[in-house]
């Protein structure tokens, strides 16, 4: 790991807000590289990711890779694709899924990490937390509308998505345009960025 990236990694571990995780031997879970051309900003690692120490190592990750049109090898190559969740630790289980990422976490750590990745050309925002934070939206703004209007954000280097969780299968069935119209554009964007010299 590059010394600048390592310094941030160690600072995250040393931060008092993460002391409970550090005491339990749990490191922050994200993947970055100076050469990354795409950054995927998701919610927070799930229980499987925390256990295996591999981000997006579940059914949601399989679906996301399919949406992006990339292999597992490409997805986990930090010099091509950076994986930067809104919280680098599993926040625990809630009533209807995982708890949300902690407030203020992304604001504290993302800027320094993104500054070390000057080649990023596309930021894929996965789920409501990432979409609202990076597109500066209100909680009242409809995620479905934002995702449908993806072309309004491509020029700014962002591509908003719903979360690929199996729990969103009903949303997928109610919004067939997503698979038919949006995903082909996403795949083309990802491919174009990765193929750029």
Language model: regions and residue ranges:
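A polyanion-binding, active-site-adjacent surface
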Residues: 1-148, 152-195
